């Protein structure tokens, strides 16, 4: 029976053949699938494909945790926390000194290292800078700085020295922008969505939940803890600002309801409040009989009047103000009940009052002018001026009443 090649599946007619993985091959078919070089002495196989030594370790060999490149079997390596590093990659990130076996070091973000000397010097420098900043800063005026510290006091967590390094770096970023900054952690969009969803579910996660988030996102537990502290602090600040804005809105909002421009005033509102409140206090009967219709702004001077009533006749002209009477005040008589006369200043040609022209007025019933009982008292405008009465062809001396 003729043998078939495992590579090209054709019958082998050559004088010589190669036996690889218990199968027959053409000599020319035994080659690396990556670089296409002929394999004569040794080959490596994965998933039915043949590789040379270089390409096999490049693709499937252990990779350096520092540079993410493959590690060949002949390279010298160092291990830290179940991760393998090249000798050149296993260095201090501050002084770039190559770390040797047995030396104490501090690990940051699982793949960065700081030697003991640099860590101690950096910690002492940060403590001195923090003390100088706290001595010149009023803590009572900075709630943004107090909130994360209060959270840390409530959620004290035993962490490694690398966690302390991250916390000191973040405090240094908040307090002094000119100092040397430590390594910053960049949170990707997918990681941020996971953290936000966890914050909505539990704003204060336990250590077990933080460990699960660290496994899901690949972030350090200290980074996750600080993120939750900052997020809670931000939520509190937003609530304080919203509450302060609501109080300011309630304080500056006008408590009085504004009247629409087209609305009509009620007589009770006019007589009870405002600059004409003395009308509501008057106890006399202005409008009992029809003889007072000729005096729309008040009773004749024969009745007993209060000081507010007497001042109204003096101040109710178009040329006067509510604060003071006209220069030429009106003068009235005080006759008996049957004779109500008053000397009014008038002029037949002009509505403005001019002194020196007077005429007597006789009491006339309101039915002469209106054909019925006298209407109730009402104001025509804010100044109290009601205008002249309609002229009638009567045998009396008429005058405009102000």
From Swiss-Prot:
Cellular location(s): Nucleus
Alphabetical keyword list: Developmental protein, DNA-binding, Homeobox, LIM domain, Metal-binding, Nucleus, Repeat, Transcription, Transcription regulation, Zinc
DNA-binding region: 180-239
Record carries keyword Manganese: no
Principal localisation: nucleus
Pfam families tied to this protein: Homeodomain (PF00046), LIM (PF00412)
Domain LIM zinc-binding positions: 3-61, 62-125
SMART domains: HOX (SM00389), LIM (SM00132)
InterPro entries: HD, Homeobox_CS, Homeodomain-like_sf, Lhx1/5_LIM1, Lhx1/5_LIM2, LIM_Homeobox_TF, Znf_LIM
Family annotation (PANTHER family): LIM/HOMEOBOX PROTEIN LHX, LIM_HOMEOBOX PROTEIN LHX5
Assembly with partners or alone: Interacts with ldb1 and with the N-terminus of rnf12.
Domain of life: Eukaryota
GO molecular function: DNA-binding transcription factor activity, RNA polymerase II-specific; RNA polymerase II transcription regulatory region sequence-specific DNA binding; transcription coregulator binding; zinc ion binding
GO cellular component labels: nucleus
Function: Probably involved in the patterning of the nervous system, in particular in the early specification of the diencephalon.
SUPFAM superfamilies per UniProt: Glucocorticoid receptor-like (DNA-binding domain), Homeodomain-like
Amino acid composition bias (Basic and acidic residues), ranges on this chain: 151-167
Single GO biological process annotation from the record: neuron differentiation
Region described as Disordered: spans on this chain: 133-187, 291-335, 365-392
Record flagged with keyword Nucleus: yes
Regions of compositional bias (Polar residues) in chain numbering: 300-319
Protein name (database record): LIM/homeobox protein Lhx5
């Amino acid at each position: 029976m003729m043998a078939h090649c495992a590579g090209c599946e054709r019958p082998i007619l050559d004088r010589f053949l190669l036996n690889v993985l218990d199968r027959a091959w053409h000599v020319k078919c035994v080659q690396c699938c990556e670089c296409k070089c002929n394999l004569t002495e040794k080959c490596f196989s994965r998933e039915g494909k043949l590789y040379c030594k270089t390409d096999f370790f490049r693709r499937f060999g252990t990779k350096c945790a520092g540079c993410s490149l493959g590690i060949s079997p002949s390279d010298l390596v160092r291990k830290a926390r179940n991760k393998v590093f090249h000798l050149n990659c296993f260095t201090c990130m501050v002084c770039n000194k190559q770390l040797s076996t047995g030396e104490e070091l501090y690990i940051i973000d699982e793949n960065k290292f700081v030697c003991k000397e640099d860590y101690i010097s950096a910690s002492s420098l940060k403590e001195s800078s923090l003390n100088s900043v706290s001595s010149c800063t009023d803590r009572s005026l900075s709630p943004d700085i107090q909130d994360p510290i209060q959270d840390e006091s409530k959620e004290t967590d035993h962490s490694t020295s690398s966690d302390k390094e991250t916390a000191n770096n973040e405090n240094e970023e908040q307090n002094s922008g000119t100092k040397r900054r430590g390594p910053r952690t960049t949170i990707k969009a997918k990681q941020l969505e996971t953290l936000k969803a966890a914050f909505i579910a539990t704003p204060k996660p336990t250590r077990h939940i933080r460990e699960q988030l660290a496994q899901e996102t690949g972030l350090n537990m200290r980074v996750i803890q600080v993120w939750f502290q900052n997020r809670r602090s931000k939520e509190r600040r937003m609530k304080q600002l919203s509450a302060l804005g609501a109080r300011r809105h309630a304080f500056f909002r006008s408590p009085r309801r504004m009247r629409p421009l087209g609305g009509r005033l009620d007589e009770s509102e006019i007589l009870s409040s405002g600059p004409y409140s003395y009308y509501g206090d008057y106890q006399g009967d202005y409008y009992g009989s029809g003889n007072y219709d000729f005096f729309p702004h008040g009773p004749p001077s024969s009745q007993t009047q209060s000081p507010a009533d007497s001042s109204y006749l003096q101040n109710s002209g178009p040329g006067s103000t509510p604060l003071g009477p006209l220069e030429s005040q009106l003068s009235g008589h005080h006759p008996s009940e049957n004779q109500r006369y008053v000397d009014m200043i008038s002029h037949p040609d002009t509505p403005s009052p001019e002194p020196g022209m007077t005429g007597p007025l006789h009491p006339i019933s309101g039915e002469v002018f209106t054909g019925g009982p006298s209407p109730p008292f009402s104001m025509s405008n804010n100044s109290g001026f009601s205008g002249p009465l309609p002229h009638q062809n009567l045998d009396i001396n008429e005058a405009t009443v102000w």
